[in-house]
Design a protein with these regions (language model features):
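Acidic-basic catalytic patches of nuclease active cores, encompassing PD-(D/E)XK
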Residues: 46-94
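Short His-Asn-centered micro-motif
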Residues: 91-93, 105, 115-118, 138-141
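Short hydrophobic alpha-helical runs that function as membrane-insertion/retention elements
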Residues: 114-116, 134-139, 162-165
Length: 213
């Protein structure tokens, strides 16, 4: 239910219209999204993170199985060990360009990590680098080398940015594991990821494109 802004003085009308537009956007998203659920059992020996997560993804009508599963991979690789400094959440980038695919906000709404998937342009990544403590991007298309060559030199000032490449064959194999309800096991060791469901398993080795600091 929307708050009543009708008697709050000057500017109340604009405030109400803003609240109404936000409500409509959220309502439209809820109507069009397809809900996917994953019970994710994570064993990350590289980060010493061992946890079970019940993940709910509101999938945009235009999102492919491949992209959705890359978001799940990104969640597994970045979810913090605890919630003392906030949570990593799936965001609404396909509905709202001002949001990433996932983000980790602390309890003051500070963006601790911004995660994009796909091939964002350099301007988007630089804006994200100015808003968040850390920015991570995962590209999974066969055209990744071309995309990266075009923007690499434009990102040198973004010291808090890390870009990863997922080989197209690996992301396509991962897409075949997608189901509306999944029980997903993820093991991370020495930079390699093993993801398994009832439909099969996939080995993934993300390759870092940005230079190590």
């Amino acid at each position: 239910m929307l708050p009543n802004y009708s008697d709050t003085g000057p500017g109340a009308g604009a405030l109400f219209q803003y609240a109404l537009s936000r409500f409509k956007r959220m309502f439209t998203m809820a109507l069009k999204a397809t809900i996917y659920k994953a019970q994710l059992q994570l064993t990350d020996m590289d980060r010493n993170v061992y946890a079970d997560h019940n993940v709910i993804i509101a999938r945009h009508p235009s999102e492919t199985d491949e992209r959705m599963m890359i978001r799940l991979l990104a969640f597994a690789l970045n979810v913090p060990a605890d919630d003392k400094q906030g949570n990593l959440e799936f965001a609404k980038d396909l509905w709202d360009v001002d949001e990433p695919a996932l983000w980790h906000k602390d309890y003051t709404e500070q963006i601790r990590q911004w995660i994009d998937v796909g091939q964002p342009d350099d301007k988007r990544l630089m804006r994200a680098a100015g808003r968040a403590e850390r920015v991570t991007a995962y590209s999974f298309s066969s055209s990744t080398p071309v995309w990266w060559k075009a923007i690499e030199t434009k990102l040198t000032r973004a010291a808090n940015l890390v870009v990863w490449q997922i080989e197209a064959a690996e992301s396509q194999a991962l897409a075949k594991l997608a189901e509306r309800s999944m029980q997903l096991q993820v093991t991370v060791q020495d930079g390699s990821v093993w993801m398994s469901t009832a439909l099969g398993s996939v080995d993934i080795t993300p390759r870092r494109l940005t230079a190590s600091s």
